[in-house]
Amino acid sequence: MIPGEILTDDGEHELNAGRATLSLVVANTGDRPVQVGSHYHFFEVNDALSFDRAVARGFRLNIAAGTAVRFEPGQTRTVELVALAGERAVYGFQGKVMGPL
C-alpha cells in the first residue's frame, strides 16, 4: 500500500449519494482561464465566472476530491453542484460568508 492510497471495489461508485444537487450554466467572461477545485465554495469563485451566485450559495462542484474544472475564456458550460455537508459553515475563500450558511 502507498501512503494516502485508497483501495476500492471494482465497478462504478456514486459520489455524494443522497445529497442535494443542482445544475448551473456558468460562463467565463474574462480573458484568462479559471480553474475551480472540487471543494471550493462555488458562490465565491472568481468574479469572471458569470452565473446565478445566489443559487450556488452553500454548494461546491460535484466532482471527485482533488480534481478541478477549468473554464476557458469565453466558454460557457453546465456544471453540477452538490450541497456542502457537515456543519454547513464557510470560512475563508473570498470572505463573503465567514460563518454558517
Swiss-Prot record:
InterPro entries: Urease_beta-like, Urease_betasu_sf, Urease_subunit. It is an enzyme of class 3 (hydrolase). Pathway: Nitrogen metabolism; urea degradation; CO(2) and NH(3) from urea (urease route): step 1/1. It catalyses: urea + 2 H2O + H(+) = hydrogencarbonate + 2 NH4(+). Pfam families: Urease_beta. GO terms for molecular function: urease activity. One of its GO terms (biological process) is urea catabolic process. One of its GO terms (cellular component) is urease complex. It is found in: Cytoplasm. It comes from the Bacteria. SUPFAM superfamilies: Urease, beta-subunit (SSF51278). Its EC number is 3.5.1.5. Keywords: Cytoplasm, Hydrolase. Gene3D superfamilies: Urease, beta subunit. Its main location: cytoplasm. Transmembrane segments: none annotated. Heterotrimer of UreA (gamma), UreB (beta) and UreC (alpha) subunits. Three heterotrimers associate to form the active enzyme. This is Urease subunit beta.
